Amino acid sequence: AAFYVGVVTNAAFASIFAANEQRVLRDVRDHEVVHRDFFAAVLGSARIPNLTPNFSSVNFGDRNSVLETARTFEDLGVSAYNGAARYIANLTYLGIAGKIVSVEARHAAAIRDLLAPRTGSFAPKAFDDANSPQTVLNAADPFIVENITAINT
């Protein structure tokens, strides 16, 4: 959520993205904020506390830098939900996770289409990755100041 908030509030946003692209990125931001707030409410004190993002590697004034980073986050999100499903014992929460991962997959496809319109890159594989929590955290590490380790999975 923090990444997309940064994208849409950046001074260059309106100049580097066409109107239809701005709409997509605002929608993705809105979805990610809902997901973040949902997890904060459901997990309560068991959630990962607020993290300090490190977006120093992202040039928010460059369309490709923003979209490449967005693709990284969306693909990582899909792999995180897919990998975490086996740890979710509560069927209600598993169903909700399934609903969220389907939205994340649409985000990934939309971002990929912005990068390479009307090509096969929107869904490059028949099956998405399913990564372990530690693999996901390792991939996210460059974008987070705090050190996070998966325990009790």
PLM segments and residue spans:
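All-alpha RGS (Regulator of G-protein Signaling) helical domain and cognate RGS-like helical scaffolds
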Residues: 1-153
